[in-house]
Amino acid sequence: PKLVAEKIRENIARTEVNKEIVILEKAPKIAIYSPKNKQPWDDAVTLALSYSEIPYDVIYDSEVLNNILPMYDWLHLHHEDFTGQYGKFYSAFKNASWYIQQKKEFERDARKLGYSKVSELKLDVAKKIKDYIFSGGFLFAMCSATDSYDIALSSENLDICHNVFDYDPIDSDIN
């Protein structure tokens, strides 16, 4: 076992490898940003954390908007879509009952939180995450979360959502 650990350390120490050993002085408090309802795909991170018995909390839009992020050291994003376009599953699942139900829930939750569109809600959530990162929080994003987070922030003040998502046209001057 020591031989394996030494090989790993040697590999990480190579200058051409973009890695670093980090000593954790305390166990990080982890939040998983995810809707409360069960989705038809698995999140490998929550599966690994659960299997490893590493504690984490599931938080979502209302908690983020209520400034809960500073309580956590690490935030994990997975299949989330911060653009208001309901993720990458539209083309394959737009007629699936779970997709239709999820879209209705997102729209209901946005209205409940005072937003007329899901894209407006998700932009504010993305801004809160940005503030969290700038304050020293660690973000681990994968899958569609990485792209949609950046797209949402960079498209502030533009309507980039097709009317199938938000019932009005996209801005005509997008380039």
Task: State what each model feature region is.
Residues 1-43, 52-54:
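Hydrophobic targeting/anchoring helices
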Residues 3, 59-62, 162-166:
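Surface-exposed patches in mature extracellular/periplasmic domains of secreted proteins
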Residues 8, 142-175:
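An acidic, glycine-rich "communication" segment
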Residues 11, 76-79, 162:
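Histidine (H) residue identity feature
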Residues 31, 35-146, 150-152:
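Helical hinge/lid and interdomain linker segments adjacent to catalytic or ligand-binding clefts
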